[in-house]
Swiss-Prot record:
Family: Belongs to the universal ribosomal protein uS11 family.
Any single Gene Ontology cellular-component annotation: ribonucleoprotein complex
Role of this protein: Located on the platform of the 30S subunit, it bridges several disparate RNA helices of the 16S rRNA. Forms part of the Shine-Dalgarno cleft in the 70S ribosome.
Subunit (UniProt): Part of the 30S ribosomal subunit. Interacts with proteins S7 and S18. Binds to IF-3.
GO biological-process terms attached to the record: translation
The species this protein was found in: Hamiltonella defensa subsp. Acyrthosiphon pisum (strain 5AT)
This protein's name: Small ribosomal subunit protein uS11
Length: 129
């Protein structure tokens, strides 16, 4: 007797009108994560995962491409507004915000949450080239 085919349940994507975009811009890479209000991750993208390797990962264009890929991944959620939280001193800080704006999302606030040490760990030594 033949087995009945197993049907996969179609996941229903819930409508989330406003979300939070976390941008971690380091000197070597840019990580973009979009979460809902509770902090549940909806989508993420990196400059390295977007096809950029080596020193090209740390460019503003690579960060822009990562933000566009992340914005495209959450189109089905019906997001209208984004709150952007930026961490780090990297070159992809402004370009990710511009990419989100160009993707059609209304940005309600841009917050800089870069961690600043109050005389914490010793920084790495200066580069001599």
């Amino acid at each position: 007797m033949a087995k009945a085919p197993i049907r996969a349940h179609k996941r229903i994507k819930r409508q989330i009108p406003n979300c939070i975009a976390h941008v971690h811009a380091s000197f070597n890479n840019t990580i973009v994560t979009i979460t809902d209000g509770q902090g549940n991750v909806l989508a993420w993208a990196t400059a390295g995962g977007s096809g950029f390797r080596g020193s090209r990962k740390s460019t503003p264009f690579a960060a822009q491409v990562a933000a566009e890929r992340c914005a495209e991944a959450v189109k089905d959620y019906g997001i209208k507004t984004l709150e952007v939280i930026v961490k780090g001193p990297g070159p992809g800080r402004e370009s990710t915000v511009r990419a989100f704006n160009a993707s059609g999302y209304r940005i309600t606030s841009i917050t800089d949450m870069t961690p600043i040490p109050h005389n914490g760990c010793r920084p790495p030594k200066r580069r001599r080239v």
